[in-house]
Amino acid sequence: MTDTATGVHSNANGVEKVPTPVFSIEGEPTQETAPTRMDPFDRPKNDNDPFEDALKRCHKILEKLDCPFVTGKEKDLDESDDMTENEDHDEMANEDDGIPSNEKKVETRKMDCTSGQLLAPKLPEKAESISSASESSEDSESVAILKYTVRTCYAIWKKRQKNSEIALKGLMIVLELCLSQPSARDDAFSALLETLGYNTVTFWKAVVPQIYNSDLSYATQYREALLFSLVLYDVNHSKNRLRELYAAVPGVRQSMLGIRAKQFGERYRHLQMKIARSRASSRMSSKMGSEENLPAMASMMNDVVFDEEPHTQSPLVDMSHDKQRVINVSNAPPVSISRKTSGSWEIKQGSGGLVACVDPVMSADKKNIWLSNLGVNMQEELKEHSTSTNSLGLPLIKQACAGEVFCVLERNEKKEELTPKQQAVESDMSLLSVLNTYNKHSYQLNPVVVNQDDYNTYYGGISNGLLWPALHNLPQYISPCFDDPELLREQWCAYVRVNYLFAINAARNSRAQDFIWIHDYHLMLCGQIMRSLESSLDIGFFIHIPFQPPANFMTKYKTVADPIMRALLRFTKVGFQTSRDRDTFVKLVAKHIKRTKIEYDSRLDRYTIEHDGWTCSLGVFPVSIKIADFVNIAKNPQTIIEAEEIKKQIMGRSADGGQLFFSVERFDYTKGISEKLRAWQRYFEKYPDRIGKDVLFQVAVTNRRSVDSYRQYQDDVLAVADLINQKFKSEDYPEWKPVIFETDGLPRTRLIAHYLAMDIGVVTPSKDGMNLVAKEMLVCNPTASLVLSTGAGTEVQLSNAQFYSEQEGKCYHRVEEISNTEAFADNFFAAATESKETRTKHGEKINQFLCVHDIDEWSDQFLDPKWTHEVISQCEVKQLGQFYGLMSRTAQVRRQIVECVLKGLPIRPHFRYSLENAKNSLESSCKSGTKLSLEADEESGEEKGFEITYDIHDELSEMEKDLAFLAFIQSDEYENAEEFIKTLGSFYEGGPVLFKNEVKQAAEMLQQGIHYNTFFTDRDGTLKSYACSYPTSVQPAYSAVIQAQFARRCATFCAIVTTAPLLHTGILEVATIPEGYYAYGASAGREWYLNPAQQFKDRSFSAIDLNLMNKVFDIIEELLERPEFRIFKWIGSGIQKHCGHITIAKQDVNGTIPSRKVIRLYEQLVKIVNDFDPNGTTLTMRESDLDFKIYVKAKLKGRIFNKGHGIRLVRERLKPNMSKGNCLVCGDNESDIPMLEECLKLAGSKVYTIWVTADTNLQEKVTQLCDRFSCSNIHFVSCPQVLLGAMAYATAHTLVDERNRKLDYYYDSDTPMDQEESSTLGASLGTSFGN
């Protein structure tokens, strides 16, 4: 047999075995003895136990290394081989893939080789080594050999010296054993990973090719076993070691998730849409009217489809994605599958709480996908795999077992006697055919097929043997077999394995825009596993049962409990049925999971927990029912007639005044049926006058009879029911029975008829997630009374809604503790004697509440992203820290928007909600118009009572533009760019017409340059209007996209040169363009940033000068702490320390600071500069409209470093060729003139320049400067949005020109295009904001 999760082969007895080895480790194979293909793992040729073989081979390796394992003698590793030395660890693992560099290192250990016990110093606690407590004494030495082999071989291999290849073979022997028995040897695999430490990436690079070779030659399927082993390790240790494998072999992740295929499918679909749109024009319809062109057009996009970094490799990308789907994942399917006597498969709509809850959501869109196990799994069969190579040793195309899973869905037996027509009928009867038919008329139902043994262990073991009773706080029903740690570990491996299969199926079926919804306790690990496969997935989890584990759950069952708690924190959001369940989870996290940050938002009733770099939102969502379905049946005349007949049939044998108590549930020990019957018995003992009157009609649908605990419980309950009927009889009504007990389920119509017939509904579970029966009862029959236990989630919901309070009245009969038989019996009596008027009054109140809070509300609220941490919540902004924090979060959201647009990814609704909430928060916090008054907080360091007022007109306006941009960017309209430019005109003070004319004139000049070899521009005032404060001058998403697209389509080297610093309230914190489009020249070009690996600074000033500037900065900071000058910290750029100068804001954009205050600040600054530099040799001070700047003079000539010097610096370091090609320069004030002058010196008349200014003096200076260099390409615009509109317009028309040129070439030329031309055309066939 083959484990579908790991690919491990087993014999008929279930013992795992490795394929027959072909290459001995004794020495290199000779020509006479060498096999056709060499075994990369050097396995000996025998059928012995693989564990024993591995031990023998370990001994041989150790002998070759002259480090034999000696029994009874301690063996110390040489100190020079200490595993804490990781100086040669792989840099890619340590940096590029984010592997923590501060991870605890493995210390050298001594080992008692007689007992196999580990002596001090020990491994770190995180390293889960093989526990001697769980091993038999005869295995202890064998385990010690494996560990010793790993440590010895690693110490030699990592030095890359003599015998390193032999040492690597030793490590591979241990690895092979782990992969051949992944469930039995997970502890050895953990020890191997911990020993390798930072060298795992290097190790995988060396070993994975051998694993692939083994799979190809011997059908070992070790690749799948390796993936599962890493998943199991990550789950058990809360790590992500899978990323190390991705770093070593990037193709592994892509093949696992089918990334290439999904990308191609998306792009191909979009290309078809574009072709369809293009056919609307007469020219395209005549030349593209034939479908024969479609494959040719698809081939044009091949290169574009597979770009790993679209924002640096491909032009504008398409945003016409499919809308978000829901990928629903559950253990149980929404259908019931059976095979008729004729042999054909039949699919019927399933029943149960999960189906009732989720089916309305799934049915809303046929593209939604439901993944579940259909009960058709891999059977335990011994299969001899056919050879995977031919007679020449070459690999066969189709490996053994390649179609094994699909055979499960088809009829396995071949009926050769059937005619072709009969075989076609037989095919139509196959399960696969039935599923396909089902999917045509509903959402997509995809089966998850697993090994049947694994499924049985996962379902009957951890899921229902441990988690089900534990989470219901019924420890007495936990299977005693889990007291054995070894058995618990084995069953836990099966649980992980099945979760892994569900997770990888869900990841493969999902797209970036989809929401993946995991359900219930069977699949608690899926979130963590899926996030290790693809970290950007949006995954939610809802637990339908209670979360009330016993007190010892986290200690006695730590093997299971700890990983599950950590795994739940990897979901984006987790939903609970009740606040009681959520509070229990939060308390357990706070107590048992270290390094967590827990926050509660009372307005949203949301907990947010941060752990290990992941954030999870916890909410409460009481499940409900589809009201209309029940009400329609209840109001049906036929149902009403049937209810009357039921009432007459049952109560016709009772005395007048009798009450019909009705209860329906699964025959489960969590439902409190046993306690209910004992209370019913006590009821008649306490109140004998009710004998002969009241009847309890109990429906308990039998299930899980194969589980011992269930079978015993059900038999005991039935015995109690018989005892009650024998004990209580009425002489006046001899046919009366106190209990009517049914074990068969009722059809929905019949069930609702019983709801109408009952007088009192009884729902008294010991623990239940919600229990929808109670809601069904009062929705159908609002005149009925309800006996409800506190164990039901419905009771918690009704209690929280004040339906059981002194103020609102007690609208139901609450059973506090079902084990309290006396009180339970009293509740029965109170319900039986309650007046009909009171009963109706209370029932109708609950009925109205339930009709409002139906199933649609439940699913809508859970699926709504607004309540999660990913969306900025609406709040009142009162303090400076809140304002800056809110704007910082909008910067994060805008970066995500820009990245999605540039990469062609779908725009998630989270982004719009976040910007809307941020905008509404600011607007509602303004006291008058756009004036926002803020007070000091602890983060600002200010005293209480200090208040500052900002005019946030720019911040609000930019958010409004971004919201409009989001609406246009998701449009499929061809001219969405042009339409958005028109929308920008609505924000223009001069009106849309004037804006359009300005944009057109500026765009015409931009188009004259056709393509710019270099592009240098200022930011604030040029590309971005001035904000009230630099920390709030976040670059809008629309602006970032326009600039990025212009840089990609219209220029070669682009740089933003600004006087702001890089960090510490600098350009990198407020910019939202991804790396790769622009270089940033901060501090007037004195410090440059392209990416983390490319940064450089000006070194023209000495350390003494820099120290002097730092002292001046400290004194100015102290000055601005004084109350009369404090205002200058919070306006404009505040106080900033740059590379080579200091900036101090003197005025805001609205000119609200009185001139007398500005003069006093100026005088103080002059005094400080003169005190430190009385001769003026080092420092100099300059003044602009909004700032004071104190510069360190250039080293040689005492000049101020300006943007012209910054251009020189970048030319020296990056060497852009400015003498060839056109150069574009944009600015808005005099500090930008040196930048223009430097470019004119280099490019002369090839310079094109646009200035954002209405200042005639500045315009004259720019014009005169250009005249000096015979440059006439000058244009002035009134505001940044005009410049951005011109850039967008020029970009769009550049695309149109290129598209037309390519299409003319394609259709008018008989010469086929080469690959580069083909991919360029395919990439150019798109909308202006889309590819």
From Swiss-Prot:
Keywords: Glycosyltransferase, Transferase. Residues 77-98 have a biased composition (Acidic residues). It catalyses: D-glucose 6-phosphate + UDP-alpha-D-glucose = alpha,alpha-trehalose 6-phosphate + UDP + H(+). GO terms for molecular function: alpha,alpha-trehalose-phosphate synthase (UDP-forming) activity; trehalose-phosphatase activity. One of its GO terms (biological process) is trehalose biosynthetic process. Its EC number is 2.4.1.15. Residues 1-13, 1318-1331 have a biased composition (Polar residues). Disruption phenotype: No visible phenotype. It holds the Pfam family T6PP_N. Residues 39-50, 102-112 have a biased composition (Basic and acidic residues). It comes from the Eukaryota. Catalyzes the production of trehalose from glucose-6-phosphate and UDP-alpha-D-glucose in a 2 step process. In the N-terminal section; belongs to the glycosyltransferase 20 family. This is Alpha,alpha-trehalose-phosphate synthase [UDP-forming] 1. It comes from Caenorhabditis elegans.
